[in-house]
Curated annotation (Swiss-Prot):
PANTHER family given in the database record: RNA RECOGNITION MOTIF RRM DOMAIN CONTAINING PROTEIN (PTHR23003), SERINE_ARGININE-RICH SPLICING FACTOR 4 (PTHR23003:SF45)
Protein source organism: Mus musculus
Subcellular localization(s) per the UniProt record: Nucleus speckle
Modified residues (Phosphoserine): 78, 84, 289, 291, 293, 441, 453, 455
Keyword RNA-binding: yes
Segments of this protein annotated with the region Disordered: 72-95, 169-489
Domain of life from the UniProt record: Eukaryota
Descriptive protein name: Serine/arginine-rich splicing factor 4
Keywords per UniProt: mRNA processing, mRNA splicing, Nucleus, Phosphoprotein, Repeat, Repressor, RNA-binding
Function: Plays a role in alternative splice site selection during pre-mRNA splicing. Represses the splicing of MAPT/Tau exon 10.
GO terms for MF: RNA binding
GO cellular component: nuclear speck
Gene this protein is translated from: Srsf4
Post-translational modification remark: Extensively phosphorylated on serine residues in the RS domain.
Covalent S-S links between cysteines: none
Length: 489
């Protein structure tokens, strides 16, 4: 039965759409849709010819399709006269999933550099169904073709070996499991894979190292608060400064140490950058000979974006930690100033209290000393007045009656003054007026005694008072010494 091939078929096309597209040209027996292409089987050959003639290049589900007669036997991968191959090109491995690998492999040598794997696959379809094709991957000017069956591979080896493709005669060699060619090809393939793996591992290591250093960097910066310097300054400056600050660091505080740490880390960061650049250059130079250079560039751009985002987050966290540390330092300074002011006020109060107590003790001792001086001056005046009165009495012995009255009046006045003095002086000076009272009682009780005996009694009382006055002065002198000792203390 005649079959029609449909190329450039839209992925959205269904069997109903294809049936509608070919409706009116004849009876359709079967519609077989593949990825990007399909087959339609007609009942009559003339209907198939009409469909191919009129529908080639028409739109089907938004795509301009290719409609041709199907070449080769139906549902069979055997060789035919060859197809146009355009639809099969579109159904390559880059769009329709991974190809199936088989052991029926041929090595194509002396392949033209203009011949792609798609061209090679289309050319090899003359011999049979091709499952996998590759060109210039392991080695330049060399390709690989894999077939579904061993018979297809043998047919291609017999029929297509020595034919010309793009002006070059190709040479087909069977790739056996024990052959040198397979070994060398697999070696070269594994070598290229290991290269790419080592590249990726180097990159990942350098990235992880740089991320670790950046984490520790953020910690040291949050401690010290000198984080904006190492970023804003150039790398060469940070290197020279790190050398200077290393020599200065033992004499300075923790701040200088953290500053010397941060340039060291910036130096390590710049080294990481330089290593990454060298590795990227190496990988770019190697990727020129291989195909996956786009993947490397994409991964680089992604890693740069991630680094930029991480640096932004770190800067925000550093600013927050700086503000927190500043507020903590301010609160500490405030509490210290408060405690200092409190201690100062307490010490001032203590000093004032001590000064007051000293002033009070001094004033007390002064008042005591002044009182004792006054009392001693009063006593001296009393003694002198009593001695003068006794002299006057001796002179006036001849006139007894007037002298008695005068002496009595004087004694009364002295007694009154003595009582006043005794009241003012207190308990320590109370026994002073006793001899005066005794002398008064003796003088009053013996009015008939002659004047000589009276004068003797008066003189005896004077001697008594004199003898008692030194004892008073002796009793006052220890009180003065006590007051002086108080004032000294």
């Amino acid at each position: 039965m005649p079959r029609v091939y449909i190329g450039r078929l839209s992925y959205q096309a269904r069997e109903r759409d294809v049936e509608r597209f070919f409706k009116g040209y004849g009876k359709i027996l079967e519609v077989d849709l593949k990825n990007g292409y399909g087959f339609v089987e007609f009942d009559d050959l003339r209907d198939a010819d009409d469909a191919v003639y009129e529908l080639n290049g028409k739109d089907l589900c938004g795509e301009r399709v290719i409609v041709e007669h199907a070449r080769g036997p139906r549902r069979d991968g055997s060789y035919g006269s060859g197809r146009s191959g355009y639809g099969y090109r579109r159904s390559g491995r880059d769009k329709y999933g991974p190809p199936t690998r088989t052991e029926y492999r041929l090595i194509v040598e002396n392949l033209s550099s203009r011949c792609s794997w798609q061209d090679l696959k289309d050319y090899m379809r003359q011999a049979g169904e091709v499952t996998y094709a590759d060109a210039h991957k392991g080695r330049k000017n060399e390709g690989v073709i894999e077939f579904v069956s061993y018979s297809d591979m043998k047919r291609a080896l017999e029929k297509l070996d020595g034919t010309e493709v793009n002006g070059r005669k190709i040479r087909l060699v069977e790739d056996k499991p024990g052959s040198r060619r397979r070994r060398s090809y697999s070696r070269s393939r594994s070598h290229s894979r290991s290269r790419s793996r080592s590249r990726h591992s180097r990159k990942s290591r350098s990235r992880s190292g740089s991320s670790k250093s950046s984490h520790s960097k953020s910690r040291s910066r949050s401690r010290s608060g000198s984080h904006s310097r190492s970023k804003s300054r150039s790398r060469s400056q940070s290197r020279s400064r790190s050398k200077k600050e290393k020599s200065r660091s033992p004499s300075k505080d923790n701040k200088s140490r953290s500053r010397s740490r941060s340039p060291d880390k910036s130096r390590s960061k710049s080294k990481d950058h330089a290593e990454d650049k060298l590795q990227n250059n190496d990988s770019a130079g190697k990727a020129k000979s291989h195909s996956p250079s786009r993947h490397d560039s994409k991964s680089r751009s992604r890693s740069q974006e991630r680094r930029a985002e991480e640096e932004r987050r770190r800067s925000v966290s550093r600013a927050r930690s700086q503000e927190k540390s500043r507020s903590q330092e301010k609160s500490l300074l405030k509490s210290r100033s408060r405690s200092r002011s409190r201690s100062r006020s307490r010490s001032k109060d203590k000093r004032k209290g001590r000064k007051r107590s000293r002033d009070e003790s001094r004033s007390r001792s002064r008042s005591k000393s002044e009182r004792s001086r006054k009392h001693s001056s009063k006593r001296d005046s009393k003694v002198s007045s009593s001695s003068s009165s006794s002299k006057k009495k001796k002179d006036t012995d001849h006139s007894r009656s007037p002298s008695r009255s005068v002496s009595k009046e004087r004694e009364h006045a002295k007694a009154e003054s003595g009582q006043r003095g005794s009241r003012a002086e207190g308990e320590s000076e109370a026994p002073n007026p006793e001899p005066r009272a005794r002398s008064r009682s003796t003088s009053k009780s013996k009015p008939n005694v002659p004047a000589e005996s009276r004068s003797r009694s008066k003189s005896a009382s004077k001697t008594r008072s004199r003898s008692k006055s030194p004892s008073r002065s002796a009793s006052r002198s220890p009180s003065r010494s006590r007051s002086r000792s108080h004032s000294r203390s």
